[in-house]
């Protein structure tokens, strides 16, 4: 069996509105990664190792994302994004505790989670309970990964509902602040579309600022999702390799 090499990426994004021509960014295609988005707006990226202070967290990256559709009320809005915990495989209990501490230290307004929470049904409750302990003023939003659909799906849904964590399965939620709003759209993992019969299309207004949350970037090849401005995806564990056109 091929050995898994796993690390957790935590990204903290600062949204800002910008009106100068230099920063005007058209709606991005779904396959555009968050890193591509950052480069397109010519913003600074800082990266730091978080080994000693937060053991178990391999990489922390901070992005400032400027876009003309971000309402002024959301200037400085902080989003924390994590994905692929695969608890309790290589990511252990102490690492999970440190992740929660690190997330709380970021003082994010919203937490977005990209799926693949666990490596066993017995770990569903503790990992979701830990994520529920992250303090965010505007909620935690999640899509599920292929691992989550393969096992314990019903239990995951129950646990998320019990902890008031928003599961986005072809759904759009609205975040409101001072009369303005941004949208968070979430889609199901593409490996499961055919068997679950969920419509793969989300129609979103080009006038809204839309964050698309998906487990895998391969989703862009299978569904029609238009007018998204920022795409956050997991699954690839820091890289993307495909063979013969198959999913990574």
What annotation goes with each model-predicted range?
Residues 86, 117-118, 147-148, 172-173, ...:
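Catalytic metal-binding/acid-base residues of hydrolase active sites
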Residues 56-58, 70-166:
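Membrane-embedded segments
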Residues 76-86, 181-190, 211-215:
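Active-site-proximal beta-strand elements of phosphoester/diester hydrolases
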Residues 40, 52, 64-66, 129-193, ...:
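Extended active-site neighborhood of metal-dependent phosphoesterases/phosphodiesterases
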Residues 203-212:
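Short beta-strand/loop segments at the ligand-binding rim of alpha/beta enzyme cores
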Residues 132, 217-248:
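Conserved beta-sheet core of the metallophosphoesterase superfamily
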Residues 2-78:
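Acidic, histidine-bearing metal-coordination/catalytic regions of metal-dependent phosphoesterases
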Residues 177-179, 195-196, 240-247:
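Short, charged, surface-exposed secondary-structure boundary motifs
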């Amino acid at each position: 069996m091929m050995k898994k090499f796993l690390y957790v990426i935590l990204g903290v994004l600062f949204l800002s509105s910008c009106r100068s021509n230099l920063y005007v960014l058209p709606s991005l295609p779904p396959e555009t990664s968050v890193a591509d988005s950052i480069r397109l707006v010519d913003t600074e990226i800082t990266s730091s190792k978080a080994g000693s202070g937060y053991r178990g967290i391999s990489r922390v990256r901070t992005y400032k994302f400027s876009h003309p559709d971000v309402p002024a009320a959301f200037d400085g809005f902080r989003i924390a994004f994590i994905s692929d915990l695969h608890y309790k495989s290589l990511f252990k209990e102490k690492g999970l505790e440190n992740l929660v501490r690190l997330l709380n230290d970021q003082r994010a307004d919203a937490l977005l989670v990209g799926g693949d929470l666990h490596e066993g049904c017995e770990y569903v409750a503790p990992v979701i309970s830990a994520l529920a302990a992250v303090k965010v003023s505007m909620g935690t939003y999640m899509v599920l990964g292929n691992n989550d659909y393969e096992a314990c799906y019903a239990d995951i849904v129950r646990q998320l509902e019990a902890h008031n964590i928003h599961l986005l399965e072809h759904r759009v939620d609205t975040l409101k602040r001072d009369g303005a709003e941004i949208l968070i759209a979430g889609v199901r993992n593409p490996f499961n579309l055919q068997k679950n019969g969920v419509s793969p299309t989300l129609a979103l207004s080009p006038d809204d600022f839309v964050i698309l949350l998906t487990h895998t970037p391969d989703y862009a090849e299978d569904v029609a999702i238009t007018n998204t401005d920022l795409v956050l995806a997991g699954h690839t564990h820091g890289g993307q390799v495909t063979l013969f056109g198959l999913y990574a």
